[in-house]
Swiss-Prot record:
Component of the MCM2-7 complex. The complex forms a toroidal hexameric ring with the proposed subunit order MCM2-MCM6-MCM4-MCM7-MCM3-MCM5. Component of the CMG helicase complex, a hexameric ring of related MCM2-7 subunits stabilized by CDC45 and the tetrameric GINS complex. Interacts with the ATR-ATRIP complex and with RAD17. Interacts with TIPIN. Interacts with MCMBP. Interacts with ANKRD17. Component of the replisome complex composed of at least DONSON, MCM2, MCM7, PCNA and TICRR. It is found in: Nucleus; Chromosome. This is DNA replication licensing factor MCM7. Its EC number is 3.6.4.12. GO terms for cellular component: chromatin; chromosome, telomeric region; CMG complex; MCM complex; membrane; nucleoplasm; nucleus. The lineage of its organism: Eukaryota, Metazoa, Chordata, Craniata, Vertebrata. There is a cross-link at residues 15, 28 (Glycyl lysine isopeptide (Lys-Gly) (interchain with G-Cter in SUMO2)). ATP 1 binds at residues 345, 384, 386-388, 489. Keywords: Acetylation, ATP-binding, Cell cycle, Chromosome, DNA replication, DNA-binding, Glycoprotein, Helicase, Hydrolase, Isopeptide bond, Nucleotide-binding, Nucleus, Phosphoprotein, Ubl conjugation. Residues 521-564 are annotated as: Interaction with RAD17. It comes from Homo sapiens. It holds the Pfam family MCM_N. One of its GO terms (molecular function) is ATP binding. Early fractionation of eukaryotic MCM proteins yielded a variety of dimeric, trimeric and tetrameric complexes with unclear biological significance. Specifically a MCM467 subcomplex is shown to have in vitro helicase activity which is inhibited by the MCM2 subunit. The MCM2-7 hexamer is the proposed physiological active complex. Residues 332-538 form the MCM domain.
Amino acid sequence: MALKDYALEKEKVKKFLQEFYQDDELGKKQFKYGNQLVRLAHREQVALYVDLDDVAEDDPELVDSICENARRYAKLFADAVQELLPQYKEREVVNKDVLDVYIEHRLMMEQRSRDPGMVRSPQNQYPAELMRRFELYFQGPSSNKPRVIREVRADSVGKLVTVRGIVTRVSEVKPKMVVATYTCDQCGAETYQPIQSPTFMPLIMCPSQECQTNRSGGRLYLQTRGSRFIKFQEMKMQEHSDQVPVGNIPRSITVLVEGENTRIAQPGDHVSVTGIFLPILRTGFRQVVQGLLSETYLEAHRIVKMNKSEDDESGAGELTREELRQIAEEDFYEKLAASIAPEIYGHEDVKKALLLLLVGGVDQSPRGMKIRGNINICLMGDPGVAKSQLLSYIDRLAPRSQYTTGRGSSGVGLTAAVLRDSVSGELTLEGGALVLADQGVCCIDEFDKMAEADRTAIHEVMEQQTISIAKAGILTTLNARCSILAAANPAYGRYNPRRSLEQNIQLPAALLSRFDLLWLIQDRPDRDNDLRLAQHITYVHQHSRQPPSQFEPLDMKLMRRYIAMCREKQPMVPESLADYITAAYVEMRREAWASKDATYTSARTLLAILRLSTALARLRMVDVVEKEDVNEAIRLMEMSKDSLLGDKGQTARTQRPADVIFATVRELVSGGRSVRFSEAEQRCVSRGFTPAQFQAALDEYEELNVWQVNASRTRITFV
């Protein structure tokens, strides 16, 4: 391979920066990098991002050279920009910082006192890093496909690579010294020391000509005002779970972030990082201990937040007309719910509840008191009813989620752990699963197998949406604004209808009341249902997809984008519905007391109805909650309660819905002979019956001459 002429390469770079242009909408030339150089010269911009796709248009060979030897070419580009900046400077910089004033002052003093023929010593020259007031980063070419962390090996050292993963840990942003400036206590000369490695040995003896001649032995003192610092942050990145081969542990990589790239990513973010893969050069005793092995890191040039499993950058984007047509049909609510885990047979109401969990309600913060909008759901049931499959599907569908199991999780693993930082040696916090799932969903399987001490760590998260830490002198509060989806088995493996609810579930009331919906999925023998389920499972097993039907499930990417659009809406509950909701809640409390209901109905139940109602309004992309939303929320609440009552609650509803509707209407009459049609329908719908069932019961009892409905269908009168 022939040696490169880097002087010629620098000229190519200069030519590219000056001459590259793109045509705008009007057909005029827009000098992309020329305009940025003007802003850099006037301190209106700090970072210059060089898109290598632009370089490829001009010189494809130069792109290959940059990708192969990125560190050298980054310096080459920076030098070229530094030389070009004076040409683009049209006026004096207004916003000057301390270092500007310091350098200007030194240059002015030097011009006054210096002999024209005198040459400065190398240590006394201003280093390029001190004079350079901008940052330069490369944006990888589109042909450079993202790689898995475990595929970045020794052959990638020094090259520009793009990797994807999840951020597990982020350090505080601290100042990193780039140039150290010293002043001599004897002769007053200034010495500059550019720093390239993570550690450096400060200079002690003055190297100036005066001190050397006089042998005065002047000592150097660090002058922080004249030194240059840059923002520095360390980040740990781990492979996605789907990138890890079977039986392997997820690999992680250290990413060192500087300047404008800091504070972009948070723990739990899915990111794509373009950077230079380099070894860490240890010095002194550490090198002796380390031997021939070397740790590696990625010097970040560009960090992009990603959606969980999409190739494009984060952000939902507008839906096309065709996509909106797919969603906006008459039964879109049922269609969206059925698109959740279409391979799993049945569980229609459970899927509707999970859809509302993904959309979420609206957060309220009246005078600093926070009322959560996230919906928490617990699925409890017999083994083999697809609870874990539903959880894993939600984990894949949610843009941001964490999946964990009860026995494999400790309280610290869920909340936060105190670790010692490898660089600074300070104690730092590392977020657990609930912190990493902030603004997302945390799925906890085998919830009943968790130790009681670990389960109590979740109480604060489920209501206050925060985690308060008081460990090793660190007192802080972390955000954990996530919905919790838990799956658990009953206490004795299967649900025993002969035992009470408390004996079957064995979870504390404080925890159960924090779940908006607690759903019991039982595996009851039913010939027709079992036959359909068996046919469904065998088809899925043979063809690895759901059986053909008239219904076509929506694509996962489309659902994710639609849910992201729904979450932007902030619907409110109108005053006209306030009385209706309070009346429904009071009725639920009365019924629970009268029937000695095993489930606990508290003020949290009312908040759960409001959350479910606002989630339904979000799903319809409207700004005001309507009566139908409240009715559906109450219906889901009633269905979840009925599932907990087991056979007792199911007999009346499943065998004779008409009889239950008749009893409900008779309750409303209470001494009189007639009742308003709308009032009766509203009460029956709020108890979980559909308008069609109400109509069927009405017709049935009218034929039996038990009651009569007037011609305008506004009143029901008992005969």
